Amino acid sequence: VVWENDWPVVNPGAGMLTDTVEIELPEWRPETDVNSYTYRTGAKTCVPGSSREYDFTNMKVLGDEFLFLRNPEENMYQLTEKGLNLHFSPVTLKEKASPSYIAIRQQHHRCKVEACLKTDGLTSARRAGIAVVQSDEYQLRVEVGDSKADVILCEKGMDQCVGSAVVEDKEVVLSIAIDELKATVGMKDSKREIILAE
């Protein structure tokens, strides 16, 4: 901002507001700036504004951008050369307790979340998946268990199955694509890629 006669001039030279304004700021790369948190933590956290793509097989610790619900058990998860292993808990996302759940805060109105999931060992009582969670009463989940993937919309604490498909492989990629107030839930395996719900 430039000051003229004790008044701020936001767009000098144009004399009016425009749709865009060019601001001359030096480029900042937090991964190389010794004063930045990203640099000081040894790239434990993602660079601000960067794509959030994680390869858990190469991680020693979770970055600070990962969140947990309430007070999780210390041994709730493990990072190994095979990836991120969450230990099963009877607590669900609908309870005001500490489920086996690791999250990243949604930062944009348009985004896509994907997770590769091993399905062996999953049953109707031992389910795993991904979710967009607003609270214990409002969430969109895609869960795999008992050779089936279910898309569950929870509103006011009531679950409604809005899509499902048979799971044939021992490994699937689950996805939730958000576009403003709409969501598309998908699943892919070695043979197919399908939309489970929109």
Model-derived features: positions:
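Beta-propeller blade signature
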Residues: 1-4
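Extracellular glycan-recognition regions
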Residues: 6-198
